[in-house]
């Protein structure tokens, strides 16, 4: 099974390194510098020291990847619509399975990644690849656990077999909505946890915040499903609890580090300046706005997410934010 990966950031490249040890992989990037760097030294600047196998070919033209039987989309969620439109314009075959490896909610429409793909590429089957997985550890082939969510059991089982690696425990799920909700929310909660840690409020407050975060995940998950139901296996599995713990406790998390810098700013902070200092996308920044608006649309209360939103977008004070986060 030929595999293409769209997005040569840290995460997309890490997946390419992992799969490329035994399979032929096509990695697409729109960035000429990234293209030349990987082709020249077989290494990404985002993952120094992690060699990219010769089984991985890098392409600049999106037309060069459309013949693969599986396409993994590892682009930022806010760029997903544009990439899907490019695939549509290239007449992507209807039998090509699309695996979404991006996390977030589109700001302009409040749609999940799967809903964006269904809108633009309605005939292509969809799966979700999510769980606790820092790109650098995946690239170094350290052990990790993930969820492959797909509503088609036959296709899902086939994709699990294709993506399975010796160092990966890959679980199957039918819950594509729950897995995506959990994946998006954990980045916002990681920012909140970073603010608490940066403000030196201690690990007790940190642990309490993570615990309260699960209630907000359940609330949005239930409202999005529409009938009030949730899958306990999703909530307590790698895609939710596992990813939440990892993202909210390690400074390897871009979102936690972002929040930490805000909380640790003794003389005030500038959100845009902190964002510009990073080399990678802080998905939780965009997702905070999406979640705030989606919660309003669904008429549910999410005080932690609202507090993070008001801090990032409405210049709420650290003091007012912390009063919510540790209440």
UniProtKB/Swiss-Prot annotation:
Record-linked InterPro entries: 6-PGluconate_DH-like_C_sf, 6PGD_dom2, G3P_DH_NAD-dep, G3P_DH_NAD-dep_C, G3P_DH_NAD-dep_N, NAD(P)-bd_dom_sf
Record: residues binding sn-glycerol 3-phosphate: 103, 131, 133, 186, 243, 253-255
Gene Ontology annotations for the cellular component aspect, listed alphabetically: cytosol
Listed pathway(s): Membrane lipid metabolism; glycerophospholipid metabolism
Record bears the keyword Kinase: no
Compartment(s): Cytoplasm
Keyword annotations from UniProtKB, A to Z: Cytoplasm, Lipid biosynthesis, Lipid metabolism, NAD, NADP, Nucleotide-binding, Oxidoreductase, Phospholipid biosynthesis, Phospholipid metabolism
Xref: Gene3D superfamilies: N-(1-d-carboxylethyl)-l-norvaline Dehydrogenase, domain 2, NAD(P)-binding Rossmann-like Domain
Matches recorded under HAMAP family: NAD_Glyc3P_dehydrog
Name the record gives this protein: Glycerol-3-phosphate dehydrogenase [NAD(P)+]
Organism annotation: Wolbachia pipientis wMel
Gene name in the database record: gpsA
